[in-house]
């Protein structure tokens, strides 16, 4: 019995994580809260991506696709109009 008690005492003295102070608890639970927040944000981004926006306005800078007009020229026209508006 004495040998097992001695080995337990030796193991307890080698345990450097036995006593936790407030700072280590704060770090641990802060990491849990941060991970939960990231999970919620990523899941919201994935779920919101599939929902179509019903109030989309093409004049807010979004480029909608038209037939026969390439994207590059449309972007150029939008920039040109914005430059004229600033004059």
UniProtKB/Swiss-Prot annotation:
It is a single-pass membrane protein. Residues 63-72 have a biased composition (Basic and acidic residues). This is Protein anon-73B1. Keywords: Membrane, Transmembrane, Transmembrane helix. Pfam families: UPF0239 (PF06783). It is found in: Membrane. InterPro entries: UPF0239 (IPR009621). GO terms for cellular component: membrane. Belongs to the UPF0239 family. Residues 73-87 have a biased composition (Basic residues). The chain crosses the membrane at residues 25-47. Residues 52-87 are annotated as: Disordered.
């Amino acid at each position: 019995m004495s040998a097992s008690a001695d080995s337990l005492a030796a193991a307890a003295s080698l345990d450097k994580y036995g006593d936790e102070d407030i700072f280590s608890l704060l770090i641990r639970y802060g990491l849990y809260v941060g991970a939960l927040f990231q999970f919620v944000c990523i899941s919201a981004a994935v779920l919101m991506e599939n929902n179509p926006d019903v109030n989309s306005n093409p004049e807010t800078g979004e480029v909608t696709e038209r037939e026969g007009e390439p994207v590059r020229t449309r972007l150029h026209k939008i920039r040109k109009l914005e430059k004229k508006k600033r004059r």
